[in-house]
Amino acid sequence: MIKERVIIVGSGISGCTAALRLMQDYDVTIITKGYKEESNSMLAQGGVAAAVSKNDTPKKHFSDTFQAGCFHNKVLAVNQLVTHGPMVIQKLIAEGMAFDEQDGELALGLEGAHQLPRILHTGGDQTGKFLTTFLQEKLTDIHWQEQKMAIEIIKQNDSAIGVHCLDKENRLHTYYGEHIILASGGLGQLFPVTTNAATISGDGLALAYRAGAKLTDMEFIQFHPTLLFLNGRCHGLISEAVRGEGAKLIRADGSAIMTDVHPRADLAPRDIVAATLFAEIQDGNEVFLDITAIPNFEKRFPGITANLDAHHIPFRETKRIPVHPGAHFLMGGIRTDLSGKTNIPGLYAIGEVANAGVHGANRLASNSLLETLVFGEKVAEYIRTQKINPIDHPEIPLSNQIQTPHLPDKQLLQEKIWETLGITRKPEKITEFLHWLTDFDYANHTRKTAEISHMLITAKLIAESALKRTESLGAHRILKGVIK
């Protein structure tokens, strides 16, 4: 019997979860732009938020998620996240996933805007790496297509039936399937300062848009408050869990920054902390994390410690880490239902590239990994309810190409996006930026031109959404508006 084919674009936790739940009965292929180890999931430090402790409940997790999201979240999506979260965690543990423990119980960390500790972690601050590796090692019966950049979703009779890709030598490869799942992550590389992997440049968002998928809430981009900052450049994330363990944000003179800003001070929602730090930096102040209150810092955060040592940060002596906000996570994305379905038959989206309404205007810390797990399970459950007979498709060529495209320099584009669509925004600047974008073409005959084109399309979608939302909300901060 010929198996139905599932094509998954993206090698992170959401795509790997879906693949794991489908591989026994489906012909599953994972396509990834780089190597399978290169994803935002591998970089995730903090952990997975889930109501698994005796003192916690899904209702409390629901409340924290909604408040952090400025009540812009969708009720059913958040309810699915927080109620299925504990079950997904127990399933993983039963399958052999080992989360950190303390005194025989799960060790739970505290992060911003959570009312109590509920963050499961492993390897201290290397949860994403350990969890992604755990899932990938279980994928014993799938096809991996590494170093293949997806450049076009193939449609027939208004349904998605495949993906065109380019390899490192810009040779075209085509993969057909009855189910196409986008799990390609967000858009961090649109910005010059980001926590994201080098491969994350809005590809899936642009592909979906060009295919006719609906995208929503694109103006809501979370900027993480604390990236390691040195000599004008950022060198990786300093997890929010560091503040959860007691670190404080301070100025060079040692004065506290967040004390009078929000009742939760250093553990306020990320949009508030990032905007506050950005204002400090705009005023000419350097910003640091004071880790004096964490005596076991090196043991609790081995990954961060290694990164600090690699960049010769004298944190053991100074108890300070220089930090700066940077692009971290897209709350919006491809509109989906609770099963990951888009408005295009045969096309699904899960993880950061998708927007089921879980995060609202600002994501609650460590809800991202939970989302990847829950929605990876849900899309697999739905696909299992569908019966589609596999058919051979006639070879469908790549859409018409512009032979001599006019595209901007990537660094210039990143700088303009940061100036226009960064932590604070001005409507007149956004209008100018949209006009500037009209000078350029779309092209995808090489990986380089395809990536810049995807960045242009994604930036345009963000700018248009930002201009439509005339008042500030969550991570979207229009300077003339009132921040809610």
From Swiss-Prot:
Keywords: Cytoplasm, FAD, Flavoprotein, Nucleotide-binding, Oxidoreductase, Pyridine nucleotide biosynthesis. Pathway: Cofactor biosynthesis; NAD(+) biosynthesis; iminoaspartate from L-aspartate (oxidase route): step 1/1. Its EC number is 1.4.3.16. FAD binds at residues 11-14, 33, 40-47, 203, 352, 368-369. GO terms for molecular function: L-aspartate oxidase activity; nucleotide binding; steroid dehydrogenase activity, acting on the CH-CH group of donors. Belongs to the FAD-dependent oxidoreductase 2 family. NadB subfamily. One of its GO terms (biological process) is 'de novo' NAD biosynthetic process from L-aspartate. It is found in: Cytoplasm. Gene3D superfamilies: FAD/NAD(P)-binding domain, Fumarate reductase/succinate dehydrogenase flavoprotein-like, C-terminal domain, Succinate dehydrogenase/fumarate reductase flavoprotein, catalytic domain. It comes from the Bacteria. The active site is at 270 (proton donor/acceptor). Binds 1 FAD per subunit. The keyword Cytoplasm applies. It holds the Pfam family FAD_binding_2. This is L-aspartate oxidase. Its cofactor is FAD. SUPFAM superfamilies: FAD/NAD(P)-binding domain (SSF51905), Succinate dehydrogenase/fumarate reductase flavoprotein C-terminal domain (SSF46977), Succinate dehydrogenase/fumarate reductase flavoprotein, catalytic domain (SSF56425). Catalyzes the oxidation of L-aspartate to iminoaspartate, the first step in the de novo biosynthesis of NAD(+). It catalyses: L-aspartate + O2 = iminosuccinate + H2O2. The record marks 111 as: Important in orienting the L-aspartate substrate. One of its GO terms (cellular component) is cytoplasm.
